[in-house]
Amino acid sequence: MGRSRYHNKLKEGIFEAEITALSHDGRGIAKVDGKTTFIPFTLPGEVVKFEYTFTKAKFDEAKVVEYVKKSLNRVNPPCDHFQICGGCSLQHMSTDAQIEHKQQTLINQLKYIGNGVEPENILPPLRTSNTEGYRNKARLGVRYVSKKGKILVGFRERNGRFLADIDKCIVLNPLVGDKITEISSFIETLSIYQHIAQLEIAIDDTRPAMIVRHLEPFTNEDLEKLRSFAQENNYWIYLQSKGPDTIFRLYPQGDVEPKKLSYQPAAGIDIGFEPNDFTQVNNDINKKMIKRAIELLDISENDSIIDLFCGLGNFTLPISQHAKTVIGVEGEPTMVKRAKETADNNNITNVNFYAANLFESFEDKEWFNNFEYNKMLLDPPRAGAQEVCNNIEKFNVKRIVYVSCDTAALARDAGILVNTKGYKLISAGVMDMFPHTMHVESIAVFEKI
């Protein structure tokens, strides 16, 4: 029997609709004859004329032909590549409106995904001092395009299939973002330019580092060119031929100081990191976020605090300046090792770090059984902290500060804490970690009733 496939004929002509909301990827949403239609580069409240570009059983896609009514929140995108490059999704929306939208997204998801959870107070949003040049971490694709006769370096196009042809990136730190053309031209001089797949960028307080992911070996001449490029631009260059364990630093060579990249999360603390380690992309907001987390924990000198999903100690080490003891727990052993080294290098003696998978049972772990805590900080990845929240009564903590990069996961976990574990949501708010994108960084405070 042959397979039957659903085929819908694309509607022809020009249609009109009002945009009522934004999708998770920043496209405008309109309801046309009861069916959801996604229309890019539109904002809620706008009325547009459009034509269909794609249709499926449950939704349609379209493009704007004319703006009949424009939103007061509409601005001219600061980047010439905005409509092509997929790196940003909200440059056509004022930064104030972006924050308001993200704040409302948080409140809505707490209510609907968290089954009625509402914060007693809305925290004022943490704003960044610069919505351009803020991004210090990125993975940039590299591809030789024969039709264009050149190397492309950048993010994928909005459709996700090809790399966008860009000459600069305004959200990347300008030490890299202003040099996209220079970097792509340099790669063209290498013998294996068609076999370089990716550049992983990490920028500390003073210098950029670049991991060059290559699929074929470099020649000696290539290596000399890479060293010269690094020296001329004050870059640290790393090479990666296969998995993460193959990464090594090509330039500078030898036992140089400093041995690692580093940043200061708070006064008096230097955290060393490798370019493939997880660090926050926005240094300005990171410092403000840490300060806010410490304020919301309401730390006294007798507090014992546990920091789960602690990474390199981004929160743990600054918290240690205010608390009696702090324990950091992280799933990646390499990061735990670096966190311990950082504590030693900064002469911090009231912290300790442990490696543990926090997505499975941890009741047999030393850090769980041999210490008592009265407060907790959570900073999980996008998956959230469901296992921890399901077992929160075993920690017996009075206050929880939860930092989240995924509002849906936070809302789910808030529902667990508030509806089944006897906590109340004191306050919640957003932080402008990712301007011009739909990514939402948020923070919430829970207190035991």
From Swiss-Prot:
InterPro entries in the record: 23S_rRNA_MeTrfase_RlmD, MeTrfase_TrmA_CS, NA-bd_OB-fold, SAM-dependent_MTases_sf, TRAM_dom, U5_MeTrfase_fam
The protein, known as: 23S rRNA (uracil(1939)-C(5))-methyltransferase RlmD
Reaction equations catalysed: uridine(1939) in 23S rRNA + S-adenosyl-L-methionine = 5-methyluridine(1939) in 23S rRNA + S-adenosyl-L-homocysteine + H(+)
Superkingdom to which the source organism belongs: Bacteria
SUPFAM superfamilies: Nucleic acid-binding proteins, S-adenosyl-L-methionine-dependent methyltransferases
Coiled-coil portions: none
Active site: C405
UniProt KW keywords: 4Fe-4S, Iron, Iron-sulfur, Metal-binding, Methyltransferase, rRNA processing, S-adenosyl-L-methionine, Transferase
Gene from which the chain derives: rlmD
Keyword Methyltransferase belongs to the record: yes
Binding positions for S-adenosyl-L-methionine per the UniProt entry: Q280, F309, N314, E330, N357, D379
Organism: Francisella tularensis subsp. holarctica (strain LVS)
Purpose: Catalyzes the formation of 5-methyl-uridine at position 1939 (m5U1939) in 23S rRNA.
Keyword Amino-acid biosynthesis (UniProt): no
Domain TRAM stretches: 1-66
Family: Belongs to the class I-like SAM-binding methyltransferase superfamily. RNA M5U methyltransferase family. RlmD subfamily.
Any GO molecular function: RNA binding
EC number: 2.1.1.190
GO BP field: rRNA base methylation
Residues involved in [4Fe-4S] cluster binding: C79, C85, C88, C169
